[in-house]
């Protein structure tokens, strides 16, 4: 069993062990992907993220 979550109406995470939320949608995994220092594809992922503006440094700053 893996910990999973879904977003409620207030966009807050609700953690569960089920694969579907009460609304019927799929839940998301609460665990990050595994990391390997020998990752051969990280260079290409960074290139793609730069191209599409997905790096954290490329996001607009939000004012709270």
From Swiss-Prot:
Gene3D superfamilies in alphabetical order: H/ACA ribonucleoprotein complex, subunit Nop10
One GO term of the biological process aspect: snRNA pseudouridine synthesis
Origin: domain of life: Eukaryota
Compartments in which it is found: Nucleus, Nucleolus
GO cellular component entries: box H/ACA snoRNP complex
InterPro entries to which the protein is assigned, alphabetical: H/ACA_rnp_Nop10 (IPR007264), H/ACA_rnp_Nop10_sf (IPR036756)
GO molecular function: snoRNA binding; telomerase RNA binding
Protein keywords: Nucleus, Ribonucleoprotein, Ribosome biogenesis, rRNA processing
SUPFAM superfamilies referenced in this protein's UniProt entry, alphabetically: Nop10-like SnoRNP (SSF144210)
Known function: Required for ribosome biogenesis. Part of a complex which catalyzes pseudouridylation of rRNA. This involves the isomerization of uridine such that the ribose is subsequently attached to C5, instead of the normal N1. Pseudouridine ('psi') residues may serve to stabilize the conformation of rRNAs.
Cross-referenced PANTHER family: H_ACA RIBONUCLEOPROTEIN COMPLEX SUBUNIT 3, RIBOSOME BIOGENESIS PROTEIN NOP10
Family classification: Belongs to the NOP10 family.
Assembly and interaction partners: Component of the small nucleolar ribonucleoprotein particles containing H/ACA-type snoRNAs (H/ACA snoRNPs).
Protein name, per record: Putative H/ACA ribonucleoprotein complex subunit 3
């Amino acid at each position: 069993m893996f910990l999973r979550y879904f977003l409620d109406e207030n966009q807050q995470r609700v953690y569960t062990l089920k694969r579907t939320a009460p609304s019927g949608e799929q839940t998301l995994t609460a665990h990050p992907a595994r990391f390997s220092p020998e990752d051969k594809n990280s260079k290409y992922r960074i290139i793609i993220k730069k191209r599409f503006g997905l790096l954290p440094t490329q996001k607009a700053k939000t004012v709270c």
